[in-house]
């Protein structure tokens, strides 16, 4: 067997769908965890500097942010390990196995492992869909605030109704209704709109949302490829076929 033929056979056994899904999963989780962590920190800073004069008003929010940040640490570690395991399982069920070990023979244990990965990937996919939907909430809040900032710039140019434009963090449940001041208007709002912290935090939440979307797509790709491979292992292993998905 020549070197070129060997390379062709090796490339033919690569689970490209699983490989692409692994890369997409790593990128998505990295975006979600890294940007989400910094966005939460930026949110805490904005609340502290502009929306509340008393720490007790946002003490619960600080605790919630810390809990989410710890969850992010665990999510990053678990997703990296699970992505590697899924990629290894994809390689196991490709033509590379048949090329190395001859006729495709699978054990009951091997099929059970594949079925387990399908179930876990499905459960994780549903969970990440919920995370994806939840991560849209801060994007909506910051988009509303950004839209108000654009209105402030327009009103500033016209010079009327400047002090009537406000952003109230209490209406989103971020702060209790007895928080003081809880909202910012006029010059204070314009000052916040011009800060780099606000722009950075807004874009970080957008990146977090995009990372969650990428992770959902990766898990759906994993699920399709794992289901296809399992079908081949269970029903078509007696035929002269192999998986390349």
Swiss-Prot record:
Expression (tissue specificity): Highly expressed in white matter in myelinating shark brain.
Transmembrane residue ranges: 19-35, 71-87, 117-133, 204-220
Main location: membrane
GO BP terms, alphabetized: axon development; central nervous system myelination
Subcellular location as annotated: Membrane
Annotated keywords: Membrane, Transmembrane, Transmembrane helix
GO terms for MF: structural constituent of myelin sheath
SMART domains: PLP
GO CC terms, sorted: myelin sheath; plasma membrane
Membrane topology summary: Multi-pass membrane protein
Keyword Metal-binding: no
Family classification: Belongs to the myelin proteolipid protein family.
Protein's name according to its UniProt entry: Proteolipid protein DM alpha
Organism: Squalus acanthias
Lineage: Eukaryota, Metazoa, Chordata, Craniata, Vertebrata
């Amino acid at each position: 067997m020549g070197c070129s033929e060997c390379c062709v056979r090796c490339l033919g056994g690569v689970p490209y769908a699983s490989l692409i899904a692994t890369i997409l999963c790593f990128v998505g989780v990295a975006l979600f965890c890294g940007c989400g962590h910094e966005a939460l920190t930026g949110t805490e800073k904005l609340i502290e500097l502009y929306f509340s004069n008393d720490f007790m008003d946002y003490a619960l929010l600080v605790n919630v942010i810390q809990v989410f940040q710890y969850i992010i640490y665990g999510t990053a570690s678990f997703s990296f390990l699970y992505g590697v395991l899924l990629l290894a399982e994809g390689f196991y069920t490709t033509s590379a196995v048949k090329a190395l070990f001859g006729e495709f023979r699978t054990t009951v244990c091997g099929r059970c492992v594949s079925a387990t990965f399908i179930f876990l990937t499905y459960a994780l996919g549903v969970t990440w869909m919920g995370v994806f939907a939840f991560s849209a909430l801060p994007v909506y809040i910051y988009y509303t605030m950004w839209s108000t900032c654009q209105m402030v710039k327009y009103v500033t140019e016209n010079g009327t109704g400047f002090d009537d434009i406000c952003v109230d963090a209490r209406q989103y449940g971020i702060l209790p209704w007895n928080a003081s001041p809880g909202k910012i208007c006029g010059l204070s709002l314009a000052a916040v709109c011009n800060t780099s912290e606000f722009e950075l935090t807004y874009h970080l939440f957008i990146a977090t949302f995009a990372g969650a979307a990428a992770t959902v797509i990766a898990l759906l790709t994993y699920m399709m490829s794992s289901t296809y491979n399992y079908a081949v292992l269970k029903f078509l292993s007696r035929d002269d076929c192999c998986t390349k998905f």
